[in-house]
């Protein structure tokens, strides 16, 4: 099992597997946790270290608000750039055999810090790394946006999405349309 969540010490994921007798790798990538767990799982399978991996993530709106922004009980007004964390969970079983969808390739990103320090505008903070990773993936795989049915990121918010689209456009790729 490879998994994580948005809370300190990935406590939810760790407690979820506490009685599981197999191996567990905890990952913490905030908005990228699901993609990160699937990339790690795919690498483990491709490298011959596992035949199957279960990749999971979860998040909880109120817990994320308390940890990253303001507890809801404070009644603080949200800024227009604040993200909306989902309350939910998801998982995927990756296997070295079968006929399901295929994890064909993936690209690990890099940290790009442009100095954004507003905790209510994490989309602007994440946009440079998101756009860099998207473009690096196109270059590494010799693909273009038209080769994909869907390109997803974590919640960049409206402003972060706008910044990401512009940065990707400056690199020569058009994601809209």
Outline where the language-model segments fall.
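Active-site-proximal alpha-helical scaffold in enzymes
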Residues: 27-55, 94, 128
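Condensing-enzyme catalytic core mediating Claisen C-C bond formation in acyl metabolism
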Residues: 71-135, 140-143, 177
